Amino acid sequence: MHYPTALLFLILANGAQAFRICAFNAQRLTLAKVAREQVMDTLVRILARCDIMVLQEVVDSSGSAIPLLLRELNRFDGSGPYSTLSSPQLGRSTYMETYVYFYRSHKTQVLSSYVYNDEDDVFAREPFVAQFSLPSNVLPSLVLVPLHTTPKAVEKELNALYDVFLEVSQHWQSKDVILLGDFNADCASLTKKRLDKLELRTEPGFHWVIADGEDTTVRASTHCTYDRVVLHGERCRSLLHTAAAFDFPTSFQLTEEEALNISDHYPVEVELKLSQAHSVQPLSLTVLLLLSLLSPQLCPAA
């Protein structure tokens, strides 16, 4: 391949983009917690990795923690403004939690959302379902279903999550769904034998992309795959590039004690490679300029 042709190929290939979706149990996130400088700094750095992040275990009753966190995130990250979408407070007693989506609003928008109607009261914190747009012609939208199970009813809640999937896929006429969150799906909360009997494991089409055995906990004394991401849909799966827990203590050089001030969980992440979507994107001015400079070499005179 001639040099100009190779350069042109690289220019066009670089028009592709990755899209990262994350879930993080932020462990009793309150205003007092985010007001601590190291906690705020670390949370902002974690959030800035993601195009969509769903935070779990937000227990702030003041209503001020998320706006403060959003303000600092937008000050930190220069790749475009973030917005948030919060569920109502969810729970059965005085202890209530909120699911909060942070998303880069120049890359994705909320198309619709609702709290799952848990008529049988199976879930301690019913899923807060949201449909997001994606910058892709192959997969223009995607449904996210977050769930933070209670350890005492993991198996029951995860079996009910299959019913949520059925309702959601019918509601939006889409099979492209990601189930994600702190499922507590390991160790004492759910044995491997019981895990493998879940409908989300036995029914075809569900891909558990955080591998069994991958540690999603901060403490050195634990090794549990509590946090999960489950993909469904051929289009969604075809775009999958990577999936992993993010070991933020190692990446940010934190001691275990410092990391536990943030959370006892790692975030879990999936990266969709939208380059495989073959979406048509407008060429930047830089690319157009380079093409004009290369044109005499690409099309030599006869």
From Swiss-Prot:
Keywords in alphabetical order: Disulfide bond, Endonuclease, Endoplasmic reticulum, Glycoprotein, Hydrolase, Nuclease, Signal
Catalytic residue list: E97, H148
Domain of life, per lineage: Eukaryota
Entry comment describing in which tissues the protein is expressed: Highest levels in skeletal and cardiac muscles. Detectable in all other tissues tested except brain.
Family from the record: Belongs to the DNase I family.
Gene Ontology CC terms, in alphabetical order: endoplasmic reticulum; extracellular region; nucleus; specific granule lumen
Any single biological process term in GO: DNA metabolic process
Keyword Endoplasmic reticulum appears in the UniProt entry: yes
Pfam families xrefs: Exo_endo_phos
Protein name, as recorded: Deoxyribonuclease-1-like 1
GO molecular function, one term: deoxyribonuclease I activity
Record-annotated disulphide pairs: C187-C224
Glycosylation, residue list: N261
Extent of the signal sequence: 1-18
EC number(s) given by UniProt: 3.1.21.-
SUPFAM superfamilies linked: DNase I-like (SSF56219)
